[in-house]
A protein has these predicted regions:
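Generic beta-sheet signal
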Residues: 74-80, 99, 147-151
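Membrane-embedded segments
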Residues: 83-138
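Non-catalytic C-terminal accessory region of glycerolipid acyltransferases
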Residues: 2, 133-269
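Generic preference for hydrophobic
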Residues: 64, 78, 101, 122, ...
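A transmembrane-helix-recognition feature enriched in membrane-embedded lipid enzymes
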Residues: 2-63, 115-119
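Soluble extramembrane domains of integral membrane proteins
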Residues: 61, 68-72, 83-90
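Short, flexible loop segments at the rims of nucleotide/cofactor-binding pockets, characterized by
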Residues: 54-57, 78-79, 100, 125-130, ...
Length: 269
């Protein structure tokens, strides 16, 4: 049996059934907890446990760097590139923060999933008809509860790992809410599971946390420039993204903004 066939059989007859069990058990606990815990904190812990189990079972080792750049107790908007479905467990397992995802409204059509996501604080956005005022109001409510947000501004997974253009809408909301933006570079997950492919392989992934970018003092008209700056930073740390690396070198003139707080690995998530 060749290597490709082995990984296909391993995916279909081992990983999918085992991960299915993890999802049913932890998903049931998460849904049950949301009936009494509207904060979603316990549901988030279930999501982190689910992420750790998936990565361990698949054989994905994650090298996490840059957590010391984050300030303990602060709320952030984490902005990441999107290579693979595995980006989500990598991020949830690596960032010791209470995270909520900004996702497509279409997820809300799945039985139980949409109801559960909304109930535990995740934001589902209709990109065709976004209610900016409503989204901003919900963002501020989450910030008031000490929650951080994770967004994938490319809007879809990259088929080849290259970082696509970042949509400016989320950055406009970040500016209006006055929230710091943290660029996150995720690399290697495309070799674990590529877009449009079922086969999953063990491998190494890397998550790099860049310096937070303060949005105080920025105007709504700066959203596009902020999106391009963050995209350049993220792409510059992704392997083989030469265009992104050139953009990142061009953005190096922007002064770094460091938060001198305690390392985020000590944050209670």
């Amino acid at each position: 049996m060749d290597v490709r066939s082995f990984h296909w059989w391993r995916t279909v007859f081992f990983l999918i059934p085992v991960i299915g069990v993890y999802t049913m058990v932890l998903g049931t606990l998460s849904i049950a907890s949301s009936l009494i815990d509207r904060s979603g904190h316990f549901a988030h812990r279930c999501a982190r446990a689910w992420s750790w189990l998936i990565l361990a079972t698949t054989g994905v080792r994650v090298d996490v760097r840059g957590l010391e750049r984050l300030e303990r107790g602060r709320t952030y908007i984490f902005v990441a590139n999107h290579q693979s479905i595995y980006d989500i467990p990598v991020i949830f397992a690596s960032l010791p923060y209470q995270l909520r995802i900004i996702a497509k409204e279409s997820l809300g059509r799945f039985p139980f999933l949409g109801w559960h996501l909304r109930r535990t604080g995740h934001l589902l956005v209709d990109r065709r008809n976004p209610d900016r005022a409503g989204i901003l109001r919900r963002w501020r409510a989450l910030v008031g509860e000490g929650l951080s947000l994770i967004i994938f501004p490319e809007g879809t997974r990259s088929p080849d790992g290259r970082v696509g253009a970042f949509k400016a809408g989320s950055f406009l909301l970040a500016i209006e809410a006055g929230l710091p933006v943290v660029p996150i570079s995720v690399d290697g997950t495309r070799f674990v599971m590529r877009k449009g492919h079922l086969t999953t392989r063990p491998g190494d992934a890397r998550l790099l946390v860049h310096e937070p970018i303060e949005t105080s003092g920025l105007a709504p008209g700066d959203a596009r420039a902020l999106a391009e700056r963050v995209r350049a930073i993220v792409a510059g740390a992704v392997t083989h993204d030469e265009a992104g690396a050139e953009d990142a070198r061009g953005s190096a003139t922007a002064p770094p903004q460091r938060n001198p707080g305690a390392a985020a690995r000590h944050v209670d998530a």
